[in-house]
């Protein structure tokens, strides 16, 4: 396992009012729970087994092994960059793609120990991974991150823009620094990473880009003007880039999670949990693995090759 450094947490959704209290649930704090993939199987029938979700890449890997033994040829596994991948949703995505046979660059901003653990888990499963510490809102860090992946594995096939932060506050009290920090990481970071990775994808006329947005980008939320604006921007950005890159066979989609199980939700009182769950038709929190299952489908499943410019909500029916 290799480690690179240069300088992530994906989003949050907040309930406007819960008995006079306001609650913000950071998605990136969502832990990868035991029984990996079990929840995804229940929620996404098309991904009801890991073999369906990853049949394309695993078939390639199996074929490569046979051909290599007989004729010295091989089929390369896809190279993936996941930003903000040290914990929560990003961690679940990195593990899912790593275990599916991809080579994964695990990006982090501060949580180096957690990122190393993600890489080790991928390697323990037989995959390849490296970590890179860098701030995706800084152009020089993004360029270094892309170079690290290319130097190690020769290319970038898939980009998952997951890194993000929240700096909540009512608009009248929000400081410009709170606004700018969220916009810089959650929106400008997506722009910088996409632009850098797309240069590589365009040359070979193939690639997949998945942006992690939020239901807040669709419906807004009091106290999160900065975050809502950034995620709405990610959604508009996704659709525009999908149009620009479609002729180069680059698929660009967004995933918009709702309330996702996290360390914070596990510590909530029964009354608060009850009020939150009343807003979710399915009556439960989502799991990081469910988001990862959807991302995996969009990233490597051949059945998603005709899907681009779409926003997939995964919120238990909260915004339908």
Curated annotation (Swiss-Prot):
Pathway recorded for this protein: Lipid metabolism; fatty acid biosynthesis
Record flagged with keyword Lipid metabolism: yes
InterPro entries: 3oxo_ACP_reduc, NAD(P)-bd_dom_sf, Sc_DH/Rdtase_CS, SDR, SDR_fam
Transit peptide, from-to: 1-61
UniProt-recorded name of the protein: 3-oxoacyl-[acyl-carrier-protein] reductase, chloroplastic
Keyword Transit peptide found: yes
Top-level taxon of the source organism: Eukaryota
The reaction(s) this protein catalyses: a (3R)-hydroxyacyl-[ACP] + NADP(+) = a 3-oxoacyl-[ACP] + NADPH + H(+)
Subcellular location per the Swiss-Prot or TrEMBL entry: Plastid, Chloroplast; Plastid
Complex and partners: Homotetramer.
Keywords: Chloroplast, Fatty acid biosynthesis, Fatty acid metabolism, Lipid biosynthesis, Lipid metabolism, NADP, Oxidoreductase, Plastid, Transit peptide
Binding site for substrate: 214
Sequence positions that bind NADP(+): 82-106
Similarity-based family: Belongs to the short-chain dehydrogenases/reductases (SDR) family.
GO BP terms in the entry: fatty acid biosynthetic process
CDD domains with a match to the protein in the record: BKR_SDR_c
MF terms (GO), sorted A to Z: 3-oxoacyl-[acyl-carrier-protein] reductase (NADPH) activity; NAD binding
GO CC list: chloroplast
């Amino acid at each position: 396992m290799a480690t690179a450094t240069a300088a992530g947490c994906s989003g949050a959704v907040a309930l406007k009012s819960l008995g006079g209290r306001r609650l913000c649930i950071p998605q990136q704090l969502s832990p990868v729970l035991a029984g990996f993939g079990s929840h995804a199987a229940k929620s996404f029938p098309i991904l009801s087994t890991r073999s369906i979700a990853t049949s394309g890449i695993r078939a390639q890997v199996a074929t490569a092994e046979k051909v290599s033994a007989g004729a010295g040829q091989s089929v390369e596994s896809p190279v993936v960059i996941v930003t903000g991948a040290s914990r929560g949703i990003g961690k679940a995505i990195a593990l899912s793609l790593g275990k599916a046979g991809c080579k994964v660059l695990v990006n982090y901003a501060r949580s180096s120990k957690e990122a190393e653990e993600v890489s080790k888990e991928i390697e323990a499963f037989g995959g390849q991974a490296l970590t890179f510490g860098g701030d995706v809102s800084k152009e020089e860090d993004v360029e270094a991150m892309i170079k690290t992946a290319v130097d190690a594995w020769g290319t970038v096939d898939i980009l998952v823009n997951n890194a993000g932060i929240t700096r909540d506050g009512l608009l009248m009290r929000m400081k410009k620094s709170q606004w700018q920090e969220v916009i810089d990481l959650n929106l400008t970071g997506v722009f910088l990473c996409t632009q850098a990775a797309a240069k590589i994808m365009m040359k070979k006329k193939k690639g997949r880009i998945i942006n992690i947005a939020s239901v807040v980008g669709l419906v807004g939320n009091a106290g999160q003007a900065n975050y809502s604006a950034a995620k709405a921007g990610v959604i508009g950005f996704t659709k525009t880039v999908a149009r620009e890159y479609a002729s180069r066979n680059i698929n660009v989609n967004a995933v918009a999670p709702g309330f996702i199980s996290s360390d914070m939700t596990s510590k909530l009182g029964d009354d608060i949990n009850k009020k939150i769950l009343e807003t979710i038709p399915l009556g439960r929190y989502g799991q990081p693995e469910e988001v990862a299952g959807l991302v995996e489908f969009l990233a490597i499943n051949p059945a998603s090759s005709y899907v681009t410019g779409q926003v997939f909500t995964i919120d238990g029916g909260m915004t339908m």
